[in-house]
């Protein structure tokens, strides 16, 4: 007997079911990370620029920049922007590194020249003091004269005593004996290349009116001394400064009205002292400030290498 299967079973089709799992991908990132990265890059650039500026300028220039940022005035005519100092019109040439032996030799030469200049200056000031003392002795003014060698130069004090006054009381009219002394001193001061400062001092006796006071009197007396020196042949460019101190620097503070407080001081400056004054008042700034800074930098490098 022929087997006949179930037609329904024979005619049925096999259905294959495929299950597909869909993965949800994260959405696209926004542009916030670009902003953060740009801020980070800008901050790093500012940091590197600051480090470069600090490394490019010298110590004195850094102090000038700091003073300018704080609104302070600086003696060498400051007001220059730091960019003017570190951004030259032409790119700087690459620095050549000198051999240690050459650097040390140059440092020794500088130290030797500085020592010779100091020795020469001290010798000249000593000879000047001897000449001034001789002139004062011949004029019988030993009691009116004092001299002192200080780091800035030779300090010459010509003062009143109980017997003689250099000027008429309360006036800038110079007395004959003091004029004679200044005339004798003029060629002595002119014999050296050193500049001089003339300063007037008074005692503490006050004026009755405020129109003319001890400031005016001390300044006028210093100017009178300068005028006599120049009339005696001393060049006018020999005087670097004329100043008035009134009664601010009394020699005899216990006796403010003492005659010894009334005096004229003549300071014969060393070369370094006059250079410092040029620096303070802004003249010859490039010729004075930069060499001093370079000299100090070289001395610092030399001291670090010898440690």
Swiss-Prot record:
Presence of keyword Cell inner membrane? yes
Q: Where is this region: Disordered?
A: 87-108
Task: Show the PROSITE patterns listed in the entry.
Answer: OMPA_2
**Ranges of residues in domain OmpA-like:** 154-272
Q: Which UniProt keywords apply?
A: Cell inner membrane, Cell membrane, Membrane, Transmembrane, Transmembrane helix
Any one GO CC term of the record: plasma membrane
- Parts forming coiled coils: none
Q: What is its main location?
A: membrane
Question: Which InterPro entries does the record cross-reference, listed alphabetically?
Answer: Bact_OuterMem_StrucFunc, MotB-like_N_dom, OmpA-like, OmpA-like_sf
Provide the membrane topology annotation: Single-pass membrane protein
Q: Where are the transmembrane segments?
A: 32-54
Compartments it resides in:
Cell inner membrane
Question: Superkingdom of the source?
Answer: Bacteria
Annotated family: Belongs to the MotB family.
Question: Record's PANTHER family?
Answer: LIPOPROTEIN YIAD-RELATED, STATOR ELEMENT OF FLAGELLAR MOTOR COMPLEX
Give a short account of what the protein does: Part of the flagellar gene cluster Flag-2. However, the Flag-2 flagellar system could be inactive in strain 042 due to a frameshift in lfgC.
What name goes with this protein?
Putative flagellar export/assembly protein LafU
Q: Which organism is it from?
A: Escherichia coli O44:H18 (strain 042 / EAEC)
Lineage of the native species? Bacteria, Pseudomonadati, Pseudomonadota, Gammaproteobacteria, Enterobacterales
In the UniProt record, the gene name given for this protein reads lafU
